Amino acid sequence: MISGHNCLQVGQIAPDFSATAVYDQEFKTIKLSDFKNKYVILFFYPLDFTFVCPTEITAFSDKYSDFSELNTEILGVSVDSEYSHLAWLQTDRESGGLGDLEYPLVSDLKKEISIAYNVLNSGGVALRGLFIIDPKGIIQYSTVNNLEFGRSVEETLRVLQAIQYVQAHPDEVCPANWKPGDRTMNPDPIKSKNYFAAA
């Protein structure tokens, strides 16, 4: 990765950006800060018209309503131009395209966003980085995959639900594999024994 002085970490403010995106077959200028007071799933993918990428992008779109119900917007980003994004969106899924999406695809042609989020590799494309940003603009979760394998939309949704739960219940924490409805834990040496005793 091209990192320079970038040491972006969970718990830090997500770098704002302004860029051209494609949404509803139109070019629009968007800023990350446009989505303040919402959670944001910001995910990077290597290139348009590739192979693993459309499976991820369409999977997020197909689950969009689940994220929207949780006050969450999704933004996909690659180093392609907005014209490439539009052409891919105008290609149907049966031909390896995207068809219509429920969220914007952002053009990072100058690679500034990928650099800011420390996901640009030495080949000049973004690794499969994913960031969950809370309504205060703080990065609560980040993960980066190599190019050859995709991410789990279901796991992203689960983590988002866990983040929202602990933010609403600051005296509780979510154990491994937690899902809504599961038991949580009190982060206290004595009170936590109640969780472990019932596990």
Curated annotation (Swiss-Prot):
Keywords: Antioxidant, Chloroplast, Disulfide bond, Oxidoreductase, Peroxidase, Plastid, Redox-active center
Gene3D superfamilies for the chain: Glutaredoxin
Domain Thioredoxin: 8-165
Catalytic reaction equation(s): a hydroperoxide + [thioredoxin]-dithiol = an alcohol + [thioredoxin]-disulfide + H2O
EC id: 1.11.1.24
Gene Ontology CC: one annotated term: chloroplast
Localisation: Plastid, Chloroplast
PTM (free text): The Cys-53-SH group is the primary site of oxidation by H(2)O(2), and the oxidized Cys-53 (probably Cys-SOH) rapidly reacts with Cys-174-SH of the other subunit to form an intermolecular disulfide. This disulfide is subsequently reduced by thioredoxin.
GO terms, biological process: cell redox homeostasis; cellular response to stress; hydrogen peroxide catabolic process; response to oxidative stress
UniProt keyword Disulfide bond, yes or no: yes
Main location: plastid
Alphabetized GO MF terms: thioredoxin peroxidase activity
Domain of life where this protein originates: Eukaryota
Active site per the UniProt annotation: 53 (cysteine sulfenic acid (-soh) intermediate)
Function: Thiol-specific peroxidase that catalyzes the reduction of hydrogen peroxide and organic hydroperoxides to water and alcohols, respectively. Plays a role in cell protection against oxidative stress by detoxifying peroxides.
Family: Belongs to the peroxiredoxin family. AhpC/Prx1 subfamily.
Extra facts: The active site is a conserved redox-active cysteine residue, the peroxidatic cysteine (C(P)), which makes the nucleophilic attack on the peroxide substrate. The peroxide oxidizes the C(P)-SH to cysteine sulfenic acid (C(P)-SOH), which then reacts with another cysteine residue, the resolving cysteine (C(R)), to form a disulfide bridge. The disulfide is subsequently reduced by an appropriate electron donor to complete the catalytic cycle. In this typical 2-Cys peroxiredoxin, C(R) is provided by the other dimeric subunit to form an intersubunit disulfide.
UniProt subunit comment: Homodimer; disulfide-linked, upon oxidation.
Name of this chain's protein: Putative peroxiredoxin ycf42
